[in-house]
A protein has these predicted regions:
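Extracellular glycan-interacting surfaces
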Residues: 2-807
């Protein structure tokens, strides 16, 4: 059975886009588990359609010695008497072993209780034991959404935010700690925070937050004292160094209906002075080196994107299709060199759009992928495979309603279908047969418990849920793994699982995802998912909530959270932490590693084999059969060498698209009329190709030149390339006539100026109707582009991105 788009339901995309944009992505240091279901609209995990087995899972027995060794390093904690409906885990620092667990239970607002209740636990041994420290904060009820904020640095700063009834208390309360929670200091606030307190990236003593009345509050002494520096603030984000960007209403209050009139402001001295760098914006964001905005240049016109790469000093309009009120933009991914932008397809609830890739300035965009899936709930499957440079994975919606997976190995320059796993048979040989990977859509809908996973230190390793066939299937998904960044795949686990990459890829753990019964065992692999061993970690099964491990993939501890009935037949939270470090005791040596050329297709040309974006990368990676420990100090070893330029180093230029049948970049018909304004201001010389941003290739290779490309794109705007020769006699006559005209203009200007000086007291007469139209146009333009600058929108990021811009 095929999975079609109907599973997305009728969720309003714009509302979800708004929420995702304001609140940002899930903190990489924080994970939340819940005992409640994900909603009736989600798919139950016991209602999948069934299909025959496509592959056989490889399992090897666990020796008695290893089983006893793991059992002696398995630690179970039962949170007796805790009736919290959700558990939120937050790690303090990297490699510290310190974890905070916030248990909360909320009650309806009309209940006779005030708010709800919470408990705070702390572990300093990677979750092997937890201690209730609620008394350290006087058993104060903490906010269930942003109760814990952990900053970077040593000592580890931690801030707890209380959940006080704002109808009774004039201000909120926080608890601050500079010793990772050993001690806390209570601070009474003058305001109620509306979101999590944000730390400065340079100095954790500098804090910023928005209050429930839209005030922007700053602290320069780690929360002891606060100053309200601005009113009517909608959202904010930190820029480079101590730069803070925020959008605000010109009238001091934020109204959703007036979001097209927001002002973008900037402060570089923690609120002492402000610069207005843009006006009339809808939203803004900062990711990588780019600051960008969504703007309506004229009343009633579609919205457009403006981009700055100098922290807001100057903005330029991005050459992208405009978006109507039914459409939206979404920044899928960005770094220092490039932006991937999704532009929604025209029409209501189309659930797909086009992905564009920018140049290094973020101004010119090339069409990278059409019919890119973007569901009504505001979720995109666009995934950066962090274990191998230049690799991106996503899904497209074909015209028949089928969803298929595609992958790019050169930063969106070319896309292709995924290869069928070597150990998997095709269900129907008469149809297309490829691997299709479930993404965020499936995770949100309850089809899969996790999204694809990769880690920068686990070179080439990718693991995710998928199905094999002509499109994504509604059947029970299996787990597939790739060890070369997505070029080839292997069926590794039958059925859906929770999984985690540990020890920089030297260890993978997985727990079967079930809702119909409890779990008691964990699977682990030391050969990149080729085979698995099973360890029973408890004699008392419990219902799985999820896995949790330190944000760094170098850890060898995994915590399994769930719940079961206690002796009084009440739900009880359970945490089981397994330390695999005592199983893999041998440190890896030189003999355990092998040299591996990334992106190699084993071609006959050694000069170009493995070349990607202008250079090769050779890694020293762990051998598949080496059962040893990389360790916390493991650093990826790589060697880079330059490559000569080939066609793979180029992508289609602005206004062109890749035509599969001709294998060439051809002009986009729908862009011919949209480029005229740009051509008037920029000498857009193009052959239809441009080098991929960040590409470092060397050599004299040039893509095939299309002599008519520029003329088709800019029409008759450019005349510098004209080859029409003018006879010398006619040219001399033109020069003489031009000089004569210039002299006449100078004389006339002198006479008019003299007359105006003599008649300075006269009242001028104007054509008011014409003048008013001109002033209205100028007024809108001046507000949209003050002093040649323009506006920006927020991407809250803990690493990666990606966020949404409501249009």
């Amino acid at each position: 059975m095929k999975w079609i788009l109907l599973v997305f339901g009728s969720v309003c995309l714009l509302d979800v886009v708004e929420d995702s944009f304001v609140h940002g992505k899930r903190n990489a240091r924080t994970v939340t588990f819940s005992r409640t279901g994900r909603g009736q609209s989600r798919r139950r995990r016991d209602t999948w359609t069934t299909e025959k087995e496509r592959f056989t899972e490889c399992n090897t027995p666990l020796s008695v010695k290893d089983r006893e060794l793991l059992r002696s390093h398995t630690h179970e904690t039962g949170f007796h008497g805790d009736d919290g409906s959700s558990f939120t885990l937050t790690w303090a620092g990297n490699g510290t072993g310190i974890i905070f667990v916030l248990s909360t239970i909320s009650v309806p607002s009309d209940s006779f209780y005030e708010g709800g209740s919470s408990r705070l636990y702390r572990s300093e041994d990677y979750g092997k034991s937890f201690h209730d420290i609620s008394h350290a904060i006087n058993n104060t009820f903490l906010n269930s959404y942003f109760g814990i904020s952990a900053g970077h640095g040593n000592p580890q700063p931690v801030i707890l935010t209380a959940n006080l009834p704002f109808t009774k208390d004039p201000g909120g309360k926080i608890f601050t700690s500079m010793d990772a929670g050993l001690t806390f200091r209570s601070v009474q606030l003058q305001f109620h925070p509306a979101q999590a307190i944000q730390f400065s990236l340079l100095d954790p003593k500098y804090l910023v937050v928005i209050s429930i009345d839209d005030g922007l509050w700053l602290s320069e002494d780690f929360g002891n004292n606060w100053s309200k520096v601005h009113e009517g603030v909608h959202t904010f984000t930190w820029g480079s160094e101590n730069t803070l960007f925020f959008s605000s209403s010109p009238n001091g209050t934020v109204e959703a209906a007036r979001r097209g009139e927001l002002i973008l402001r900037r402060t570089c001295d923690f609120g002492k002075t402000f610069d207005t760098i843009a006006e009339n914006i809808f939203s803004f964001g900062h990711i990588g080196s780019f600051l960008f905005t969504s703007v309506m240049e004229k009343l009633g016109s579609p919205r457009v994107i403006y981009v700055s790469k100098d922290q807001g000093d100057h903005f330029k309009r991005a050459q992208l299709p405009s978006a109507t009120t039914e459409q939206f933009y979404s920044v899928l991914d960005a770094d220092e060199d490039m932006i991937f932008m999704h532009v929604d397809n025209p029409g209501e609830d189309t659930y797909y759009g086009t992905v564009y890739a920018s140049d290094e300035q973020g101004i010119l965009y090339s069409k990278s992928l059409e019919r890119h899936l973007f569901g009504g709930e505001g979720k995109s499957d666009f995934t950066n495979i962090t274990s191998l440079r230049g690799v991106y994975l996503t899904n497209i919606l074909e015209e028949g309603g089928c969803i298929r997976s595609v992958i790019s190995f050169n930063r969106g320059g070319r896309w292709r279908y995924l290869k069928k796993p070597e150990n998997v048979d095709c269900p129907d040989m008469s149809k297309k047969c490829n691997l299709h990977i479930h993404g965020e859509h499936s995770h949100f809908s309850g089809v899969t418990p996790m999204t694809p996973s990769s880690e920068p230190t686990a070179i080439g390793l990718v693991i995710g849920h998928g199905s094999v066939g002509d499109s994504i299937s509604a059947a029970r998904p299996d787990v597939y793994v790739s060890r070369d960044g997505g070029y080839t795949w292997w069926g590794t686990l039958r059925g859906p699982h929770h999984y985690s990459i540990l020890d920089s890829g030297g260890l993978i753990v997985a727990v079967e995802a079930r809702r119909d019964r409890g779990i008691s065992s964990i699977k682990f692999s030391t050969d990149e998912g080729q085979c698995w061993k099973t360890f029973n970690f408890t004699d008392h099964p419990f219902f799985l909530a999820g896995l949790a491990s330190e944000p760094s993939s170098s850890t060898m501890n995994i915590s399994i959270f769930g719940y079961r009935l206690d002796d009084n037949h009440k739900p009880m939270w359970v945490a089981v932490t397994i330390d695999f470090e005592h199983l893999l005791t041998r440190e890896c040596n030189d003999q355990d590693y092998v040299t591996w050329l990334a992106h190699s297709n084993y071609s006959s040309n050694p000069k170009t084999d493995g070349c990607l974006l202008g250079y090769k990368e050779t890694f020293r990676r762990l051998k598949t059969l080496s059962a040893c420990r990389n360790g916390r100090g493991y650093v990826v070893s790589r060697q880079q060498s330059p490559c000569i330029c080939t066609s793979e180093d180029f992508m289609c230029d602005y206004g062109f698209y890749w035509h599969e049948n001709s294998s060439a970049c051809l002009p986009q018909p729908d862009f011919l009329n949209q480029t005229q304004d740009f051509c008037l201001n920029v000498d857009l010389q193009t052959t239809g190709y441009r080098r991929i941003p960040g590409d470092k290739c060397k050599g004299s290779f040039s893509p095939p030149r299309n002599e008519e490309a520029h003329q088709k794109l800019c029409g008759n705007v450019t005349s510098s390339d004209s080859h029409t020769e003018i006879p010398p006699a006619i040219l001399a006559l033109i020069v003489v006539c031009s000089l004569g005209i210039i002299c006449l203009v100078i004389i006339a200007a002198y006479m008019i100026t003299s007359r105006r000086i003599n008649c300075g007291q006269r009242s001028p007469e104007y054509n008011f109707s014409v003048l008013q139209i001109q002033e209205d146009d100028l007024s809108v333009n001046n507000e949209s582009t003050p002093n040649g600058k323009l506006n920006g929108f927020q991407v809250q990021e803990d690493s990666d991105d990606v966020s949404l811009i409501k249009q």
